Amino acid sequence: MTKQELEQIARITLEEKEGKLYRGYLDLRGTQITSLPDNLTVGGSLDLRGTQITSLPDNLTVGGSLYLRGTQITSLPDNLTVGGSLYLRGTQITSLPDNLTVGGSL
């Protein structure tokens, strides 16, 4: 997914810096989004509840909480970093990667 496609779906403007995307709270809840850009960094929380997304990119960094309820995600990517809480209720995720970092509750 390109930066422009993500902006169109989320109806926001993203600041691009060194190939990563930075922004505060990124609310994609209930959208038709199916993928996220590689190496995405979200400064605040990332809300993907009820989306069509099936996987997360490697090296995803979320400064706040990550909400995945109602998604089709079955596993978490390598090097996932979540500064806040990670909400997995209502997903098909059955195991966690060894290198997962979560600053809040799980």
Q: Which residues does each predicted region cover?
A:
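A detector of tandem-repeat and repeat-rich interaction/domain scaffolds
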Residues: R11-L106
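Extreme N-terminal leader/activation tails
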Residues: M1-T13
